[in-house]
């Protein structure tokens, strides 16, 4: 792609192009931050009005039954399941990634303590998203026995970090900063052969790249719905537990929604035999209902078509940045190899924060991550090839004119 006309031609031939019309995208904005917060499906506003105005406003408490609120975490989990290689009854939409990670990691450690008590080590990556590491650290602090969080600095170091004391490997499939994507089947096999359990974080994978959790024989996973799945800001996350583990995994947040018969009001907790045991308290129905609007769009295509366009978009973006912005101090930190790349492109720049603020001021919205990383997410449901061209041209102008040096772009916002 060497001209804007070529970009427009690619958009005309794009089989996913009609899906863009199902999103409410503001005029004059090129949105390359769907890896942080997905765009709003047009159906979301009407769905919110239905839930608030009709189901809550008129149905009141009856809507737990008549509008299907009570079954919503499991019903939407079944709708999400095909996107991550899961079966019906294996996914629940609930809580946040952090909370679900606490539940699932604790369940895995408890399982290992019963069957292999010597295994007290959690292996993860130092570059993992911080909340994953914080949750592991906080969980370890709750135990009265010696548990350890062992961090590796390179994916190639994983085999050497696994031993007969490893309980769980907790890995994020696509790295939030660089976009590096692990080989899920290979990593899972390595971990399981070492006798450990494999826990995947799919925050930057679900809805972005094809995932086959059951095919890989993974042991558990968590993920969010507000990024590529377009569920809305703060929309509930999800937890996946394969059926082979559901009865054996006991999570510690034993709230009433995880009880086998919540409305029996029994004084002793008896976990649900299925995925519902990973629920805890009353669910956020309004925000959870919005998740379905994003899933409705995914139902009109498949992950392989999304992946083909994702790779084409990121290939074009990287090539254009390196040609149109040649001579600028930009360093690609995202893998070039397709099998190692998620759906983002990240570049390091000495003044990355200021450059990103200048881009946002001109309507090109990406985001910034420490240290010095310009991060661009590509969401094939609504990102166009002409967006790629125009974004790079804006970046080139900002760098050539040093517009990023304006004082206002150095002011740090609370959210970057």
Swiss-Prot record:
The keyword Transcription does not apply. Its cofactor is pyridoxal 5'-phosphate. It comes from Burkholderia pseudomallei (strain K96243). Keywords: Hydrolase, Pyridine nucleotide biosynthesis, Pyridoxal phosphate. Belongs to the kynureninase family. Pathway: Amino-acid degradation; L-kynurenine degradation; L-alanine and anthranilate from L-kynurenine: step 1/1; Cofactor biosynthesis; NAD(+) biosynthesis; quinolinate from L-kynurenine: step 2/3. This is Kynureninase. GO terms for biological process: anthranilate metabolic process; L-kynurenine catabolic process; L-tryptophan catabolic process to kynurenine; NAD biosynthetic process; quinolinate biosynthetic process. The keyword Lipid metabolism does not apply. Homodimer. Catalyzes the cleavage of L-kynurenine (L-Kyn) and L-3-hydroxykynurenine (L-3OHKyn) into anthranilic acid (AA) and 3-hydroxyanthranilic acid (3-OHAA), respectively. GO terms for cellular component: cytoplasm. The modification N6-(pyridoxal phosphate)lysine is found at residue 227.
């Amino acid at each position: 792609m060497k001209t804007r006309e070529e970009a427009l031609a690619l958009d005309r031939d794009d089989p996913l192009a009609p899906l863009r019309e199902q999103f409410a995208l503001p005029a004059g904005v090129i949105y390359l931050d769907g890896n942080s917060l997905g765009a709003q499906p047009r159906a979301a506003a009407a769905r919110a009005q239905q839930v608030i105005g009709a189901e809550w406003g008129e149905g009141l408490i009856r809507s737990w039954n008549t509008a299907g609120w009570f079954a919503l975490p499991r019903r939407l989990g079944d709708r999400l399941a095909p996107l991550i290689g899961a079966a019906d009854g294996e996914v629940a939409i609930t809580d946040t990634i952090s909370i679900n990670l606490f539940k699932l990691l604790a369940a895995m450690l408890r399982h290992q303590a019963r069957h292999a008590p010597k295994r007290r080590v959690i292996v993860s990556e130092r570059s993992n998203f911080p909340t994953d590491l914080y949750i592991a650290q906080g969980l370890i602090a709750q135990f009265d026995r010696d548990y350890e969080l062992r961090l590796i600095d390179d994916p190639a170091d994983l085999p050497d970090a696994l031993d007969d004391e490893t309980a769980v490997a907790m890995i994020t499939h696509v790295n939030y900063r660089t976009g590096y994507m692990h080989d899920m089947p290979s990593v899972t096999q390595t971990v399981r052969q070492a006798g450990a359990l494999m826990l995947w974080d799919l925050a930057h994978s679900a809805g972005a790249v094809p995932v086959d959790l059951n095919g890989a024989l993974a042991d558990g996973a968590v993920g969010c719905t507000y990024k590529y799945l377009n569920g809305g800001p703060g929309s509930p996350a999800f937890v996946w537990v394969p059926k082979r583990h559901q009865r054996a995994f006991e999570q510690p947040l034993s709230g009433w929604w995880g009880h086998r018969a919540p409305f029996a009001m029994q004084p002793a907790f008896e976990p649900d035999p299925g995925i519902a045991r990973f629920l805890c308290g009353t669910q956020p129905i309004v925000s959870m209902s919005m998740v379905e609007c994003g899933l409705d769009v995914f139902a009109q295509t498949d992950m392989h078509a999304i992946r083909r366009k994702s790779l084409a978009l990121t290939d074009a973006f990287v090539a254009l940045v390196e040609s149109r912005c040649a001579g600028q101090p930009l360093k690609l930190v995202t893998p070039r190899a397709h099998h190692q790349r998620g759906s983002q492109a990240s570049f390091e720049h000495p003044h990355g924060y200021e450059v990103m603020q200048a881009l946002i001021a001109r309507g090109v919205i990406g985001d910034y991550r420490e240290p010095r990383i310009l991060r661009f997410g590509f969401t094939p449901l609504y990102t166009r090839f002409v967006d790629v061209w125009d974004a790079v041209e804006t970046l080139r102008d900002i760098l050539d004119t040093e517009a990023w040096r304006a004082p206002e772009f150095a002011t740090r916002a609370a959210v970057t």
